[in-house]
Amino acid sequence: MNLKKLFFASALLFAACGTIQAQEVIAHRGFWTTDGSAQNSLAALVKADSIHCYGSEFDVWLTTDNQLVVNHDATFKGVTMQDATAKVCTAVQLDNGEQLPTLQQYLDKAKSLKTRLILELKAHKTPEQETRADRKSVV
């Protein structure tokens, strides 16, 4: 009886070991908790890649002139992303001195990096804005 239990436990352990996989790290808003970085900044994306993060999540808003900008908060430094133009949004200075990036700038920077991008399209005020943002974000 003990031999059966030992065999069963060994088989179970062997099966479990075969299914264990390495966990991958995804940087939330990039690697922004380091010097010279800020949430969703180009620097945060590059720094996430520099520490070999599997991916980097970032947030996207649609502006009134149908441009996509990268920022976490609906309103940041007095500018409400979905109620402003891209020109107004990108004039906002991030905490590391960078200008708030457009999605295109973010994608262009990512082309030379290995980290994967995880785009979070933020919830917009109206279904129409949601639909436009959805369509615009599909690259």
Predicted regions: what they are:
Residues 1-24:
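Bacterial Sec-dependent N-terminal signal peptides
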Residues 21-139:
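Phosphate-group recognition and catalysis centered on beta-loop-alpha active-site segments
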